[in-house]
Amino acid sequence: DLILTSGGVSVGEEDHIKPAVEQLGALDLWQIAMKPGKPFAHGTVRRDAGAGTDAGRACHFIGLPGNPVSSYITFLLLVRPFLLRLQGAREIALKTIVLPAHFSLGRADKRREFLRVRRNAQGGLELFANQSSGVLTSTHWADGLVDHPAGATIAAGDTVRFIPLAELMA
């Protein structure tokens, strides 16, 4: 029902998945305004004649980014609900909690960001210092994500939308 890959869907010299999928089917979506996770792809791949009764039927394709945090975040936020829907689940909307930020983020990004954070003893959220998509330790340290809208900044004390990782793992 689904072909899921990690890496190879960006624009680098060694990114071969995207052209292969385009040759065997079609991409409906490529690159999204999300950080981490911009090189994300969705499409379909046709099954070949050797697939028996499924021959010619399309199979879903999802290509995750290659950076580990980007792959992790896009899987939780995009692939997990997709899989739940394929399985017939009706309730897939994320439950968020509004909590105060105990950090500042002075730069506004053009993309919607999902920041790795954790709750502290004071009931607020701390930001992992290095939000790079290659720093996998941020996912171990964090207990949730802040859904940070494009073009916005965060001042300490502002309320933000917190998505508990436990919600995404259930």
Predicted regions and their residues:
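Flexible glycine/proline-rich
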Residues: 22-170
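Short glycine-rich anion-binding loops that position phosphate/pyrophosphate groups of nucleotides
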Residues: 8-14, 66
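Short acidic/histidine-rich motifs immediately flanking catalytic phosphotransfer sites
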Residues: 1
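Short Gly/Thr/Asp-enriched flexible loops that form oxyanion-binding sites at enzyme active sites
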Residues: 12-24
